[in-house]
Amino acid sequence: MKVRASVKKMCEKCRVIRRHGRVMVICTATQKHKQRQG
């Protein structure tokens, strides 16, 4: 999981969600695309 100041979708399968007040990107195709803001 990457921790970044700004999270962006890296492919069309990426989804931006909010968990516990944090913005996260989860991807069903590529696990490398997982990101968390903070």
From Swiss-Prot:
One Pfam family of this chain: Ribosomal_L36
GO cellular component term of the entry, any: ribosome
Entry keyword Ribonucleoprotein: yes
MF terms in GO: structural constituent of ribosome
Keywords, alphabetical: Ribonucleoprotein, Ribosomal protein
Superkingdom of this protein's organism: Bacteria
InterPro entries: Ribosomal_bL36 (IPR000473), Ribosomal_bL36_sp (IPR035977)
GO BP annotations listed: translation
Family: Belongs to the bacterial ribosomal protein bL36 family.
Cross-referenced PANTHER family: 50S RIBOSOMAL PROTEIN L36, CHLOROPLASTIC, LARGE RIBOSOMAL SUBUNIT PROTEIN BL36C
Protein name in UniProt: Large ribosomal subunit protein bL36
Organism: Prochlorococcus marinus (strain MIT 9211)
